[in-house]
UniProtKB/Swiss-Prot annotation:
Keyword Transmembrane helix belongs to the record: no
Organism expressing this protein natively: Danio rerio
GO biological process: rRNA pseudouridine synthesis; snRNA pseudouridine synthesis; telomere maintenance via telomerase
Subunit text: Component of the small nucleolar ribonucleoprotein particle containing H/ACA-type snoRNAs (H/ACA snoRNPs). Component of the telomerase holoenzyme complex.
Keyword Nucleus: yes
Domain of life: Eukaryota
Keywords linked to the UniProt accession: Nucleus, Ribonucleoprotein, Ribosome biogenesis, RNA-binding, rRNA processing
Family: Belongs to the eukaryotic ribosomal protein eL8 family.
Name used for this protein in its record: H/ACA ribonucleoprotein complex subunit 2-like protein
Length: 150
């Protein structure tokens, strides 16, 4: 029994369970639009990681919704593989009403781990900060240039 646990732990350390971008795209839900490209997803994950270090993120549907209603600004990043979609389908509309840039990334597991959490996360808001201003501005520019859903 302990041997099996060691094998699983070894796989996680070497990255044996990582999926490619194409495999992750196959699991996205129908409302995941605009979906970030592989390159933009990587930039967003890095920006989330930098923001988490200085505690400038909002994590989870309830918290993000609360701060959108309060008028806080930032980039909203959604996980495209969240099911059921009823959990967060109202948030993109709230972002559009308040003209906040938002994008979908293919994996909630990757989004959660980039925020420094062991749990998957379906939505994160990245707030602007001076320490990662360059990366943040680059992400805002690319996210706003994505085609908006109709």
């Amino acid at each position: 029994m302990t041997k099996v646990k060691k094998e699983k732990a070894g796989e996680e350390e070497t990255g044996g369970t990582e999926k490619s971008y194409q495999e992750l795209i196959a699991n996205i839900n129908p409302i995941a639009n605009p979906l970030a490209s592989r390159k933009l997803s990587k930039k967003l994950y890095k920006c989330v990681k930098k923001a988490a270090k200085v505690k400038q993120i909002r994590r989870g549907v309830k918290e993000v919704q609360k701060f959108i209603n309060k008028g806080e600004t930032g980039i909203v990043v959604f996980a495209g593989d969240t099911l059921p979609i009823d959990v967060y389908c109202h948030l993109p509309i709230m972002c559009e009403d308040r003209s906040l840039p938002y994008a979908y990334v293919p994996s909630k597991v990757d989004l959660g781990s980039s925020a420094g959490s062991k749990r998957p996360t379906c939505v994160i808001m990245i707030k602007p900060h001076d320490e990662y201003k360059e990366a943040y501005d680059e992400c805002v520019e690319e996210v706003t240039s994505l085609p908006k859903p109709i």
